[in-house]
Amino acid sequence: MRIILHVDLDYFYVQVEEVLKPELKGKPAVVGADPQKGHGRGVVSACNYESRKYGIHSGMPISIAFRKCPDCVFLPVNMDLYVETSVRIMQIFRKHADKFELGGIDECYLDVSKRCKSYKQAEELAVKIKSELKNKEKLTCSIGIGPNKLIAKIAANKQKPNGLTAIKPEQVKEFLQKLSVRDLMGVGPKTEAVLNSINIFTIGQLTKVSEASLAEMLGKFGYTLYLEARGVDESPVEESEEIKSIGRQVTFEKDTGDKKLVLEKLQEIVSDVYKTLREYKFAYKTITIKVRYEDFYTTSKAESLKTPHTDEETAQQKARDLIEAFLLDERKIRLIGFTLSKLS
């Protein structure tokens, strides 16, 4: 019997800031660009539950967040702090797992099938993990327990913040029945709209659609969705694929055609990404540059190296080389992004 835990740190960036600044507790707070000094540029990187009451969410333009809640506390992104905290926390989680998979800076999967012979034992372990996290880091997390990664992740999302939800194999069908199709992994606004257009709103309704019909509508993903709707997920918890990529993007205060400014900002974000890479002790093989122009046209370019690299100099040089073609365009640049991937 497989028993998988999905651990999700609650509103991570803001919660870390609250530990350092206890006066933020109970106040709406956002991590992102300064809405006034930055003239409303940039987006919300993270927000606490108090700010969500005003309709603020991650990815929202900072200008809209400010309009929704002018009294919100807006904090700058402190990625070094978040990475350092994440590294410590993941070491706590890792020691409680038979197998451990990092899903991102604020989430992970734990396969506890060997050390936990029942769901009761798994719940006791989850309580222990939550207690250790609170005592050592003064942070909370939400944990989902299930027979696979899919169910564990959905379960973790059902009780936030500081929740604990366990779904046994025999409870999976009933648990999924009334949930929105959006709760399934990989279902975004576009897929949801396609399903809604044929009156499919819940996972229960989705199970009534044939595999062939889903494949016709959604291609290969249709086959995956057919299985997900039935709670089927055979993917293992994999130690080797902890983080698939590390990246950062920045929106300029004003759309710019200043080549020097773009290159300076690129150098800055490459350094930030490299710090994260170094914290996790990774090597990289692929460098990707992303550019968004003033008309919102977005494009990217990548280069893969023959062997893994660990130095910043190569990353900086390749980033400059890749962005050169984009700088020849007459349009002003709104946003640039940099990502390191194929990590090992």
Where are these regions (language model features)?
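Residues that scaffold, gate, or flank divalent-cation-dependent active/transport sites
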Residues: M1-I105
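DNA-contacting surface of Y-family translesion DNA polymerases
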Residues: H6, D183, T191-I333, K342-L343
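Short acidic, glycine/serine/threonine-rich loops at helix termini
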Residues: V16-E18, G42-S45, I151-Q159, S197, ...
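Hydrophobic alpha-helical hairpins/lids featuring a short glycine-rich hinge
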Residues: V83-C141
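Short Gly/Ser/Thr- and Asp/Glu-enriched loop/turn motifs at secondary-structure junctions
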Residues: G103-E107, G146-K149, F282-T286, R331-L335
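Long, highly charged, low-complexity intrinsically disordered interaction regions
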Residues: K120-L179
